[in-house]
Amino acid sequence: YINHPVEAAISRRYVNDARRRLEGMPRLITIGITGSYGKTSVKFILATILSEKYEVLATPSSFNTPMGITRIVREQLQPRHQVFLAEMGARHKGDIAELVDLVHPKYGLLTSVGPQHLETFGTIATVAATKYELIEGLPADGAAFFAGDGGICEALYAKTTIDKTLAGLAGNCAVRAEDVRVT
């Protein structure tokens, strides 16, 4: 407890440094990815696809907290990078909003809303509201992408007013996978 003020000041300094680095790269395309599950897989798939054309930096494994993202930005983000993929995790309401404030993504992907971390969120509605903080934090000229899960993600998609896309296996998805096989 005695070290808390010092540790908090150091953390703030690191976060502010990361924020300045990101703001100093106005051409950097920033993409936030959140969801109760599927974040890491979607991030790595997207990084693989985008790497065909762009220099991509993606947060490794599950570096999805303010200090994890801060560390990656401070230690790995270089001027050559064109795209930054930030996985955004949460255990409490407001956690995603904090990450959005750090990264300022232009694009957001919501992979799922499920019962993960109910011990801290309390209800699925709170989980959904917290995940939706990513979409709420996108700029007016940004775009949101949602899993076409036939459930909560689609309800969040319906209330979104910025450019949006529903993706999945269902026929109502604008981006749809067909004839999917596991090999």
Question: Where is each model-derived feature located?
Answer:
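ATP-dependent carboxylate-amine ligase catalytic core
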Residues: Y1-R27, T48-A129, E133
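Glycine-rich phosphate-binding P-loop
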Residues: T30-L50
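Short beta-strand segments
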Residues: G32-T34, E87, S112, A147
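Short, well-ordered turn and helix-capping elements at secondary-structure junctions
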Residues: Y37, P60, V73, G171, ...
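Short acidic/polar capping segments at secondary-structure boundaries
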Residues: S36-G38, S62, A90-R91, G151, ...
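Generic detector of intrinsically disordered, low-complexity, polar/charged segments
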Residues: I29-G32, T65, A86, P139, ...
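Acidic, Mg2+-coordinating active-site environments of NTP-dependent enzymes
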Residues: L110-T183
